[in-house]
Design a protein with these regions (language model features):
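Short, structured segments at the rim of ligand-binding sites
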Residues: 1-419
Length: 419
């Protein structure tokens, strides 16, 4: 397996461009199944999860091509295999996103129960119960979800728990359902609004995305479209934390700051100077020491669970005590054991990490366990004394585009070691 070798101690400085958002791109690719026309997607990030999603719809019969401007063109009009096989689904939980599109467009879907990051229970039962309310017949057999429907019918659906992918799945399914569907207790993440924008550009009638209630008036068919994937707020947040922990000064371009309110606010509480305009964010941590910040993850617009591992590293080198409480997913502190091997002082108490700040940490060989945990280990390597080797970096390649290249451009000493 490839590894990353990091020599710590360099302050980050300079500018980078933010990549397209994986969490916006994956549902958009899944939603392309709803149209029989050509779909052109711009600003797709080069990530393993994107490749896996293309392999998934390609295995069903989708036609996928890349033009001279590096835009992807998709056509799913001739899907002949309505099964998402375990070999692909096991590597990525977001593969469940094709369920709503397939049953709405083709009346049938067979999808292996999903895999992906090993961070606890992410139940798909919210998706399945909601699809049943639209009239789908759902069965679970031999590790596969099987869904059938002659025609989905609009309904009033209140999710039992807030679910991003569940909200997205139902938005897709309801777009081709007969009549009005109302979704409540929905996720409000920016990527929900992105999916609504994409579907509406295809002719869907969706309103309320980003609010407490989403209304979808079903239509007969959806057309082709051209859509640009928005920038990745989690990638931007990760690089801002990287600059903060290295007492650096950076600017991230091509990012909408309004999507990052809680991240920016938390960085400011930690002592960073953060400025933004309509298309960039600048952070300066050269004038102050890090102040630890208590964090509780929450659905958007609260603090994102996908940033808690990175801010845990920030708190580790702040002066004093702090806590990070995870309310979204189980088992999302698997990076803590590896961080403690580098000299941090973190104790887990249930769903809370109790952190005592330390003066310094030391490089070590560490192992990534999931996507955001791997990001935290890289951040720790940037500030550690000596060399850090991060193993199993296939996790990082699922969600960060060319991370070693971008960090190197900001002054970090980091290289990828071959197998």
């Amino acid at each position: 397996m490839e590894k990353l070798l990091i020599k710590g101690g360099k302050s980050l400085s300079g500018q980078i461009d933010c990549s397209g958002a994986k969490n916006a791109a994956l549902p958009v690719i899944a939603a392309s199944i709803l149209s029989s026309d050509d779909i052109t997607l711009k600003n797709l990030p080069y990530l393993q999860d994107i490749t896996t999603m293309f392999e998934l719809i390609g295995s069903m019969g989708a036609d996928i091509s890349l033009d001279e401007k590096m835009n992807f063109k998709l056509n799913t009009s001739n899907l002949s295999n309505l099964e998402a096989r375990y070999e692909l689904v096991k590597t990525m939980r977001a593969s469940i996103l094709v369920l709503g599109s397939m049953v709405a467009k083709y009346g049938y879907a067979k999808i292996a129960l999903p895999g992906g990051c090993a961070i606890g229970s992410r139940p798909v039962n919210y998706h399945l119960k909601a699809l049943e309310k639209l009239g789908a017949e759902i069965s679970l057999n031999n590790g596969y979800i099987e869904a059938k429907a002659k025609k989905l019918i609009g309904a009033n659906i209140e999710f039992e728990g807030v679910t991003v992918t569940g909200t997205e799945n139902l938005m897709m399914a309801a777009s081709l359902a007969e009549g009005l569907t109302t979704l409540t207790n929905v996720a409000k993440e920016p990527e929900i609004s992105d999916l609504a924008d994409f579907l509406n550009s295809m002719g869907a009638k969706i309103s309320g995305a980003g609010t407490d209630e989403i209304r979808i008036e079903g239509v007969e068919e959806l057309t082709g479209t051209t859509f640009k994937i928005p920038a990745d707020r989690i990638e931007a947040g990760t690089y801002l934390v990287a600059a903060a922990v290295t007492n650096g000064k950076i600017t991230i371009n091509k990012i909408d700051p309004t999507r990052m309110g809680s991240i920016i606010e938390t960085l400011q509480k930690a002592g960073a100077e953060v400025d933004s305009n309509g298309n960039s964010i600048s952070l300066d941590m050269t004038k102050d020491a890090i102040k630890p910040v208590d964090i509780v993850t929450a659905p958007f617009p609260g603090f994102p669970t996908d940033m808690q591992a990175q801010f845990t590293v920030l708190n580790c080198i702040g002066s004093g005590e702090s806590s990070v409480t995870e309310t979204i997913f189980e088992n999302r502190f698997m990076h803590v054991q590896e961080l403690n091997r580098m000299g941090t002082d973190i104790t887990i108490n249930g769903t809370t990490a109790l952190i005592n700040g330390v003066d310094s940490i030391s490089g070590a060989q560490v192992m990534a366990t999931d996507l955001r945990a791997s990001a935290s280990l890289i951040l720790a390597g940037l500030i550690a004394k000596g060399e850090t080797i991060v193993d199993r970096i296939y996790h990082i390649d699922r969600g960060y585009e060319r991370i070693e290249e971008k960090l190197s451009n900001l002054g970090a000493e980091i290289i990828r070691l071959p197998n």
